[in-house]
Structures are given as C-alpha cells and as structure tokens.
C-alpha cells in the first residue's frame, strides 16, 4: 500500500498534470477568440458560408477536416501577428494556399487553426522594367498568367492554372520552361518570409542567403512565405494542347516517349515539353492515353514533338496561342477542380533512358494484374505519368546557384520522374488503394535497381503520405539534410514549424 506521504505526492502530481492539461487546453481554446479580437475581418468561424467554402470543399476528400477556426491574413504583418497569437497559445495550425496536396494534414487540420493565404493575392511588377514580378503567396498560377500575358511575359510557373503558387515553388516546381531555367524555385530572386519570431524578412542572394537556398525545395520548414519575386522573360507565343488516345495507341505513345526521353531525342529541344499519361479505369477495365504537349514559340508543327502528334488520337487540340495563357484551358486535366473525389499521388524516379520508359509501362500493368483486389473498389481510376527532368534543366538549376534538391544526371539523359495518380469515390477503399500504390512504387524501384536504372529521389509535390519522411534524405544525393536542419535551427530555434504545424514534410521526421 502507498504511504500517506506517497499518496499525497501522487495526488499532487496528478492534480498538477490535470491543471497543466487544462491550462494548455484553455490557451488553445482562446487562440481563435484572440484572433477574432485582433483580426475580426480575417478570422472565420464554423457555421459561416465562407468557412464552408474554405474548409468543407478541399481539392481531395482525403483532406476533409474541421479546424477550430480559419485565419485568412490580408498582409505579411497580419501573418506575423496571427503567428504570435498561435505561438502564445501553443496552438497547432496548418497553412494552406490553394490546397492542391492530397496528403492528409499537409494543408489541413482538425482541432487546430487553419491559416489560409488566399487574401495574399497581389500580382505586380517590382519596377517599370517588368523584369521581376512580385506574387502574393495566395495566388493561383492562372492569376499570375493573366497579368503577365498583357506584356507577353512568362515565369517558370505551374503547368496548370488552378495550382497554387506557394506549394509548387516550395516543392521545387515543374514547369513548361524547366529545360532553360531549372526548377520554378530557381527563378525566385527574392522571398518575403515571416519567421517564427514574427520577423518579416527578405531572403535572396544577398540577404539571408542560406534561407534563400533552403526555400528552393525545402517546403514549409523555415517560415511562412508571403510573397515570391520571380524573374520574367518574353514568351509572345506558345504552341501546344492535349490529345486523348484509345488503347490501340498506347504502344505508339510509349514508343514516342522512349525516343523523346533521351539526349538525342526530342527532349534535347529546350522549347519542348511532353507529359504523357496512361490511364486505367479499374471499374470498366478500359485503358486509354492522354498527353499534354507544349513548345515555346509559334512553330505550328514542332519537330521535337512530331512523334506524338503523328499518333492517331480520339481527340486533339493543338494550336498556337498568345503566351501560356492562350493554352491554359487546353492543358488543365479535368480532375484539377474541387470535387467529391479522393485523390492520391505517389512518385519515384529513374535514370532516364528508353529502357526506363518501357520498364515503367510494363511494371504499371504487371502490378495491376497482380492486385485483383483493387477491382473491389468503387470507381477507381489510376494514372501513370512520365515527367522528364532534362539535362538542360539540371544544368540550369546548378547555374542559378543551386538548390537543396541537387539533381544530377547519371546517364546523360536526365532524370525520369514517375507520377502514379489515383482518384476514387469511397473512403472504405483507402487502405486497399494506398497499399496498391505502395506496391507499385516498391516493384518499380526493385526492378530499376536490378537494371541499374534506379534514381533515389521523390519529387515532393507528387509524394504519397507514406513517402513524407523520405523526401529530404534523398536531396542532393543524400548530402542536403544536415544543412537544411542547421538552417531550420538557425531561423526557428524553438521548432515552431516542426511541432506546431504537425502535417506535411518535416525535417524533424526525416531519418538522419
């Protein structure tokens, strides 16, 4: 039996623990109240129509959550003020720009505060030269392209207009202009960042240059970026569009990409871009193809893409448009709007070669055949998309000053990133589908390793929930993680962006 002294000590310990928990709960409950008091026009509570618009309609239903309240700051200063309130309350929170990330918790939260940056939506030139455009973090790329099109200008931005600026750039950034300029992040000349201590600072080649480097792919680990300043360049015309194919065209489509994805192929033209996909409808068993093709300039028949445009298609729409804006509607996949679907990305990479292209295609169909249980799911569609990081892109990224991602070119053909995508209707199928996609990645990685084609990289913006811990240890062939951690410790010594923002891609979760 406990002595009276031990009993009293235990009782006091329990009482103090309960008091501490109650104190923390009280502080957290007060976070939304304090946000409302300090920023009444920027704080949204459950029950309002605006709350429903911002929260109840995520892009992917896998991210359906209910935050305690929504905070929509209208300036960097409001971001800093709101962050101070959240820190004082020890309140967990998430930051969402456009929410185009299907990983639960990456840009959503339950029982915490959701900070949305959609009010940070200015797009303006830095000066009269129009060589730099200043983009608020809450914009979609379509908003940016509408401004730039008036001056026949472009930036290394997203391929699809509905995608958010912030998420794309903080994860690297695939663009139609990568071959000449590197990642989208490599064209950022300055970041406006709110640090954990509330300081609003600039990060560029001259100021906070270590933070500037880290933000080029380091995700949401160092602060809240409120503005991106990007270099512009002239693009008066773009040729491009999309094409749909039936099953009879799949072999020609894969053959065309096998020829394209080598240094002697069409990808050697830095103006060209090709992203073909193979689609499999699990419910119907139908197999089809889809391709997005772009070429900078007004050539109505670019030779670099002839192997694709020669393939008979069920539908195609190729034309010359004014700037990238003139083709945006023709190249945005239909599932990029908000809907009632559940979405999943999963990614891996290979050293690009014709053999790698064929391996990806064969593995895709082999794993589908080996997993008949997916036929029990409701309305599942699966895609296999090829995305090439060309030798020119890798050189341009290094020439810009480099980045944490640190791509290298193993065979001289660039790096072939593979995106497996899925969308389906019912949450009851999540476990089967998540395992199926992991099996797909594991099988492709194993086969690639046996052939000497494996490239140890996962593109952050296309990662699966099971891959969030693996991202940073793969950067720069395994050498970037210690430096990223050192920079995070310097700018966020209290680990606010490691612990109070629990979701997404965290340095603290990456294996040493």
UniProtKB/Swiss-Prot annotation:
Keywords: FAD, Flavoprotein, Glycoprotein, Oxidoreductase, Signal. It comes from the Eukaryota. Pathway: Sesquiterpene biosynthesis. Its EC number is 1.-.-.-. Disruption phenotype: Reduces the production of PR-toxin and leads to a large increase in mycophenolic acid production. It is an enzyme of class 1 (oxidoreductase). Residues 63-235 form the FAD-binding PCMH-type domain. The modification Pros-8alpha-FAD histidine is found at residue 100. InterPro entries: FAD-bd_PCMH, FAD-bd_PCMH-like_sf, FAD-bd_PCMH_sub2, FAD-linked_Oxidoreductase, Oxid_FAD_bind_N. Glycans are attached at residues 197, 281, 307, 329, 361, 477. Residues 1-19 form the signal peptide. GO terms for molecular function: FAD binding; oxidoreductase activity. FAD-dependent monooxygenase; part of the gene cluster that mediates the biosynthesis of PR-toxin, a bicyclic sesquiterpene belonging to the eremophilane class and acting as a mycotoxin. The first step of the pathway is catalyzed by the aristolochene synthase which performs the cyclization of trans,trans-farnesyl diphosphate (FPP) to the bicyclic sesquiterpene aristolochene. Following the formation of aristolochene, the non-oxygenated aristolochene is converted to the trioxygenated intermediate eremofortin B, via 7-epi-neopetasone. PANTHER family: BINDING OXIDOREDUCTASE, PUTATIVE (AFU_ORTHOLOGUE AFUA_1G17690)-RELATED, FAD-BINDING PCMH-TYPE DOMAIN-CONTAINING PROTEIN-RELATED. Belongs to the oxygen-dependent FAD-linked oxidoreductase family. This is FAD-dependent monooxygenase prx3. The lineage of its organism: Eukaryota, Fungi, Dikarya, Ascomycota, Pezizomycotina.
């Amino acid at each position: 039996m406990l002595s009276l002294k031990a009993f009293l000590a235990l009782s006091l310990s329990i009482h103090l623990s309960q008091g501490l928990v109650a104190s923390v709960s009280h502080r957290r409950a007060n976070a939304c109240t304090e946000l409302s008091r300090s920023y009444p026009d920027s704080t949204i509570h459950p029950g309002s129509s605006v709350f429903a618009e911002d929260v109840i309609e995520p892009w992917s239903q896998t991210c359906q959550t209910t935050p305690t309240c929504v905070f929509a700051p209208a300036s960097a200063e409001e971001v800093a003020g709101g962050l101070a309130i959240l820190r004082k309350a020890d309140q967990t929170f998430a930051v969402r720009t456009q929410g185009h990330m299907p990983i639960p918790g990456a840009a959503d939260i339950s029982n915490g505060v959701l900070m949305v940056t959609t009010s940070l939506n200015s797009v303006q030139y830095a000066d009269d030269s129009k060589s730099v455009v200043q983009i608020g973090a809450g914009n979609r790329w379509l908003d940016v392209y509408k401004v730039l099109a008036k001056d026949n200008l472009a930036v290394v931005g997203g391929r699809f207009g509905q995608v958010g600026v912030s998420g794309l750039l903080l994860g690297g950034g695939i663009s139609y202009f990568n071959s000449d300029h590197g990642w989208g992040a490599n064209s950022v000349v300055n970041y406006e960042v709110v640090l954990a201590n509330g300081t609003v600072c600039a990060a560029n080649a001259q100021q906070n240059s270590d933070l500037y480097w880290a933000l080029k792919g380091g995700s949401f680990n160092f602060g809240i970026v409120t503005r991106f300043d990007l270099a512009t360049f002239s693009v008066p015309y773009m040729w491009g569009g999309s094409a749909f194919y039936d099953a009879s065209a799949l072999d020609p489509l894969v053959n065309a990409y096998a020829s394209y994805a080598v240094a002697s192929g069409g990808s050697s033209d830095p103006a060209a871009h090709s992203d073909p996909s193979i689609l499999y409808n699990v419910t119907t068993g139908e197999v089809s193809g889809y391709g997005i093709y772009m070429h900078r300039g007004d050539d109505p028949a670019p030779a670099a893409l002839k192997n694709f445009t020669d393939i008979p298609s069920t539908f195609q729409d190729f034309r010359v448009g004014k700037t990238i804006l003139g083709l945006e509607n023709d190249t945005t996949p239909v599932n990029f709007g908000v809907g009632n679907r559940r979405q999943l990305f999963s990614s891996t990479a290979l050293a690009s070669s014709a053999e790698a292209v064929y391996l990806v295609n064969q593995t895709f169909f082999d794993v589908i055949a080996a997993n008949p249980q997916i036929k029990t799911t409701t309305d599942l569609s699966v895609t296999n998309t090829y995305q090439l990081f060309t030798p020119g892109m890798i050189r341009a990224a290094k020439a810009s000053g480099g980045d944490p991602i640190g791509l290298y070119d193993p065979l001289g053909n660039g790096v072939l990133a593979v995106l497996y995508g899925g969308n389906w209707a019912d949450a009851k199928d999540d476990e089967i589908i998540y395992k199926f996609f992991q099996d797909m990645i594991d099988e492709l990685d194993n086969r690639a390793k046996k052939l000497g084609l494996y490239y140890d990289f996962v593109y952050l913006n296309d990662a699966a929930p099971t891959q969030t811990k693996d991202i940073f240890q793969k950067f720069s062939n395994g050498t970037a993680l210690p430096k990223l951690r050192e920079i995070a410790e310097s700018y966020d010594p209290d680990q606010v962006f490691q612990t109070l923002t629990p979701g997404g891609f965290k340095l603290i979760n990456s294996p040493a």
